[in-house]
């Protein structure tokens, strides 16, 4: 509860920002997080809560926003593709390869606010505009199928009999 309140306390200061929350993952404590977010949304008119945006709407959403904040892998894997900022909270994604658009921060109000200031500077987006996207450029399934078709599968799929 302390962590979600740190986050919400920081977000409360972003009066000129539109804030959209989506359902927290199935992690321990998600009911508390959801409850606190719903309370926040009731008293902060610049914020909204949606259970889910759905896949198509979610990617359309990522294209439109300036940043996302949270500890979801989406901020590490998908958001950099759109050349947008991710404020990655805590250590849940620790050890993953991250783009320059990802800012790893502690779940502390002041750290969160400093990060929002950092991404509001024009230099931040100039820097990430040409940053490398580490997770490919799409089309992996087509490349996989192409490789599988080249394999000599006569022996590959043959079951072996073991006499016990």
Q: What would you call each of these model-derived segments?
A:
Residues 1-164:
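Nucleotide-activated sugar donor-binding and catalytic core shared by glycosyltransferases
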